[in-house]
Curated annotation (Swiss-Prot):
Origin organism lineage: Bacteria, Bacillati, Mycoplasmatota, Mollicutes, Acholeplasmatales
Pfam families: EFP, EFP_N, Elong-fact-P_C
Species, as recorded: Onion yellows phytoplasma (strain OY-M)
Pathway annotation from the record: Protein biosynthesis; polypeptide chain elongation
Protein's cellular compartments: Cytoplasm
Protein name: Elongation factor P
Cross-referenced NCBIfam families: efp, PRK00529.1
Role noted for this protein: Involved in peptide bond synthesis. Stimulates efficient translation and peptide-bond synthesis on native or reconstituted 70S ribosomes in vitro. Probably functions indirectly by altering the affinity of the ribosome for aminoacyl-tRNA, thus increasing their reactivity as acceptors for peptidyl transferase.
Family of the protein in this entry: Belongs to the elongation factor P family.
Length: 189
């Protein structure tokens, strides 16, 4: 059991028959009355975020979460196939479980699959930045590097983002997976 006084950001708990990750917490000791802990929790099954206040000193059950590094191989109808990089076992995940992550998945991408009690898939963690190929964008003209203008670019996954005017079809760019924003050109090609 975890005491609410020992909460840490990123910790996972089982509470009200759900699995939550602690995003934020704040210990509050008012002048009058008992101390309490304000938290912001993300439900790992649904992705929803809630605010909840615990009485200080109560105990909650920890959630056994395991992260396994896997490589995305390919999509097959409504399922996405991943391979464990340690033992080469393959795992099928339905597209509904992947939610907002589909727009970043391309063949060969390494991700962390999050399991609850080693059998239930509750999430996926993408790298903070990924290098991805531009499938289509309007061609840039000479001198386009002098302004901070942006244009639309369709990536190989189908995601459309804003990129600088000097980016061309076939180039690899680095994007932030949290915000979906262009960061830089990928010079490693």
């Amino acid at each position: 059991m975890i005491n609410t006084n020992d909460f840490k950001t990123g910790q996972t708990i089982k509470f009200n028959n759900q699995i939550y990750q602690i995003l934020e917490f704040l210990h509050v000791k008012p002048g009058k009355g008992a101390a309490f802990v304000r938290t912001k929790l993300r439900n790992l099954r649904t992705g929803s975020v809630i605010d909840y206040t615990f009485n200080a000193g109560i105990k909650v059950q920890p959630a056994l979460i395991t992260k396994i590094k896997m490589q995305f191989l390919y999509a097959l109808e409504d399922n996405y196939i991943f391979m464990n990089t340690q033992n080469y076992e393959q795992l099928e995940i339905n597209k509904h479980q992947l939610k907002d992550f589909l727009k970043y998945l391309y063949e060969g991408l390494l991700v962390d699959i999050i399991f609850y009690e080693n059998d239930e898939i509750v999430g996926i963690t993408l790298p903070d930045k990924i290098s991805i190929k531009v499938a289509y964008t309007e061609p840039g003209a000479k001198g386009d590097t002098k302004t901070n203008s942006l244009k639309d670019a369709a990536l190989e996954t189908g995601l459309v983002i804003k990129v600088p005017l000097f980016i061309n079809i076939g180039e690899k760019i680095i994007i932030n997976t949290e915000t979906g924003l262009y960061l830089s050109r990928d010079n490693n090609k």
